[in-house]
Regions:
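A transmembrane-helix-recognition feature enriched in membrane-embedded lipid enzymes
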Residues: 2-56
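C-terminal accessory "lid"/substrate-recognition subdomains
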Residues: 2-15, 177-299, 346-352
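Residue-level signal for inorganic ion chemistry
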Residues: 31, 71, 121, 155, ...
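Walker A (P-loop) phosphate-binding motif
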Residues: 40-107, 198-201, 344, 350
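Short, high-confidence coil segments that cap the C-terminus of an alpha-helix
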Residues: 86, 146-150, 165, 249, ...
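Short secondary-structure boundary segments
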Residues: 92, 133, 303-305
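Phosphate/Mg2+-binding loops and adjacent switch elements
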Residues: 94-218
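Short, flexible loop segments at boundaries between secondary-structure elements
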Residues: 281-286, 316-342
Length: 352
């Protein structure tokens, strides 16, 4: 685990510059770029198929490897659409889960079976969430179970052209595109700007950009993030920040199994939390009793994404709740795209 974390940290630094490490990896990035271009062209030629479903599909993803705030963006979008009276569902591959079956993620679904991010999305929105190896299969299963669903939000999948999309939302942070190179020499999963693949619904006219950092560029909508009014215990009670100074007389220690743990630790400190120790874990890390034993005795603070896995071993742990607020102009633009996509398939019965 330590080697993996060290390697990830080294690559994250290398991806911000075209230095020695990035240049050494460039030949592999060139080969990867060729494969990406070939796959895209196969969809254009019809040799690989894109399939539609009878609902509007909004794909929310990122071209940057690592966390940029994609899942909080999904939650914000789903919550807004629900507030507008829309019937919304979510599909995902459920990265890191042990099962490959197509299934609905419910409140009692084990995180290991449904995936930590789908579990978090369902908990936050109560929307139907389906996971499968094929996003198209997940979307069909969702529509079969909930046939009145109007809009499907796809958690990740910008590069998965098998499911036709009506709208794309691409999420960035202050790193933007790093050194501008593709993996593994740079942080990009795909070329940017992304080439159009009209047959799959992927074109710049249907694309919205979100920046979760502090310095959005022109054309990007800003998302502001905070940790809310305090932390949550296993019963859902809020523990205000002011009470954490001497919480249970134990030292406060934070852990995070996310793409960029340092960002979470810094947000805790900005809320006045004095951390005696931090433990950075790989993204989607499967918690085990000995993982937490290394921190004891202490009061554990974890991310909302990790909470269910941590509470399985320590019911006293406290969880953060990430609050992300998108500017109103983003939702105005999203609504315009929805109206444009709405007419060919669904009757406009909401008056929007």
């Amino acid at each position: 685990m330590r080697f993996r974390l060290t390697l990830e940290a080294t690559l994250q630094r290398a991806w911000m510059h075209r230095g020695v490490v990035a240049c050494l990896l460039w030949p592999m990035a060139w080969a990867y770029s060729g494969l990406v271009r070939l796959r895209r062209q196969l969809f254009r030629w019809g040799m690989l198929k894109t399939q539609r479903v009878p609902a509007i599909v909004i794909v929310v993803g990122n071209v940057m490897a690592g966390g940029v705030g994609k899942t909080p963006s999904v939650i914000s979008i789903v919550g807004h659409l629900q507030a507008q009276g829309r019937k919304v569902g979510v599909v995902s591959k459920g990265y890191g889960r042990q099962s490959k079956a197509c299934l609905e993620v419910l409140a009692d679904t084990m995180v290991s079976m449904g995936g930590d991010e789908p579990h978090l999305i369902h908990k936050a929105t109560h929307a139907p969430v389906f996971v499968a190896q094929s996003r198209w299969e997940a979307a069909n299963a969702l529509l079969h179970r909930y046939p009145d669903t109007e809009i499907i939000v796809c958690d990740d999948g910008l590069q998965d052209y098998t499911l036709y999309r009506d709208i794309e939302v691409c999420v960035f942070d202050d790193r933007e595109c790093g050194n501008g190179w593709l993996l593994p020499a740079g942080p990009l999963r795909d070329h940017w700007p992304r080439p159009q693949v009209a047959v799959c619904g992927a074109n710049t006219e249907k694309q919205l950009l979100i920046n979760t950092g502090k310095q959005p560029k022109a054309g990007q909508f800003q998302a502001q993030r905070s940790l809310g009014d305090g932390l949550k215990d296993i019963q859902g009670n809020t523990v205000p920040w002011s009470k954490l100074t001497h919480w249970n007389g134990l030292p406060l220690k934070a852990l995070a199994g996310i793409a960029r743990p340092a960002v979470f630790f810094q947000m805790l400190r900005e809320n006045g939390v004095v951390l005696a120790q931090t433990l950075a874990l790989p993204d989607h890390f499967d918690m085990a009793p000995d993982t937490l034993a290394a921190l004891q005795p202490c009061q554990i603070i974890c991310t909302e994404k990790d909470a269910s896995k941590v509470w399985a071993h320590d019911v006293s742990a406290l969880s953060s709740v990430l609050v992300q607020t998108l500017e109103p102009a983003f939702f105005d633009a999203l609504q315009q795209h929805i109206v444009s996509a709405h007419a060919p398939r669904l009757s406009l019965h909401h008056g929007h």
